[in-house]
Amino acid sequence: MKKINVVYNPAFNPISSKLNQTQLLKNASEELDIELKFFTSFDINTTKAKANLPFISNKILFMDKNIALARWLESNGFEVINSSIGINNADNKGLSHAIIAQYPFIKQIKTLLGPQNFDREWNPVMLDVFINQIKQSMEFPVIVKSVFGSFGDYVFLCLDEQKLRKTLMSFNQQAIVQKYITCSKGESVRVIVVNNKVIGALHTTNNSDFRSNLNKGAKAERFFLNKEQENLAVKISKVMQLFYCGIDFLFDQDRSLIFCEVNPNVQLTRSSMYLNTNLAIELLKAI
C-alpha cells in the first residue's frame, strides 16, 4: 500500500474555501487505497533526528508555504511535494515574473518589480522616484500587488497617481506594479497542473469586483483548453519547478491567455466542486 504524509498549515482552517481540503484528500485516498497521515506544521520538531519523526513514509505532500521547513525536511532525505525551490519560485510573485521573463514565448503582464523596503515606511524621495518610474513604464490604471498574498488579498486597482501614492504608502512590504488588463476585468482562467499534466481548468468571472478570485465572490465554470494552451500551462509548471500548481491567466485583447501568477499550494476544494470531480485523486495517483 502506498503511504503518503500530508503536512498542512492549521492557521488556514478558518478560511471557508480550505475547510474541506483534508476531507477531499481522505476521500481520494480511500478510493485509491492509499494510506494518508496528516500533520500540522506544528507537529514537526526540527530539533529531532529523522528516525524520531512521526512520518509513515519518505513522501510528504507539503500543503504549506513554509519554505524553511520544506528545506529542512529535504535536508533530512524526505521527498517534499512541492519542493522548497518550487514553493519559493511561485510564492513570491516578483520572483515568479522574473523567472517567466526568461522565456519570451510565455506572454505575461507587463510587470515592474518594486524595491525591497524591509517593512519600513517609504522614504518620500524614493517614493517619488518609484512613482515616476511607474508612470514612465505604463499608463493608468495599474495594479499594485504585494509579492506575497493569496485569495486576491493585497491586490489594489489604482486609477490615477493619487490612488497609487496612497496605496504604496500603505504598503510596508515589497510590491509589484502591473499594467491593468482592462479587457479581462473580473475574468481569468485557473489551470491546475499535476506532474506535467493538466487535470482541470476553470473560467472564473466576477461582475462586482475587478478580481476574479472565487474567494472574492467570483463564479466559475469548466474551461476547455486547446493543446497549445495545455502545453503552455505545463511549460510554466516546469520552469517554476512545481509538481502541482494552479496557474492563473488573464485574457489579452485577442482572447489569448496571458500569464498572471502561479499558486504553489493550490486549493482543490472549490475547483473540484465546479468540475464535479475530486481533483485530489489525480494528485495522489501522481505521487
UniProtKB/Swiss-Prot annotation:
InterPro entries, A to Z: ATP-grasp, ATP-grasp_RimK-type, ATP_grasp_subdomain_1, Rp_bS6_RimK/Lys_biosynth_LsyX
Chain positions recorded as Mn(2+) 2 binding sites: E261, N263
Amino-acid positions noted as binding Mg(2+) 2 in the UniProt annotation, renumbered to this chain: E261, N263
GO cellular component terms, A-Z: cytoplasm
Domain ATP-grasp: 115-287
One Pfam family named in its UniProt record: RimK
Swiss-Prot/TrEMBL GO biological process terms: protein modification process; SOS response
Superkingdom of the organism of origin: Bacteria
Molecular function per GO: ATP binding; metal ion binding; ribosomal S6-glutamic acid ligase activity
Residue positions binding ATP: K145, Q178, K179, Y180, I181, T182, C183, S184, K185, G186, E187, S188
Coiled coil: none
Presence of the UniProt keyword Nucleotide-binding in the record: yes
Keywords: ATP-binding, Magnesium, Manganese, Metal-binding, Nucleotide-binding
Binding sites annotated in the UniProt record for Mn(2+) 1: D248, E261
Positions of Mg(2+) 1 binding: D248, E261
Family: Belongs to the RimK family.
Identification of the protein by name: Uncharacterized protein MG012
Organism the protein comes from: Mycoplasma genitalium (strain ATCC 33530 / DSM 19775 / NCTC 10195 / G37)
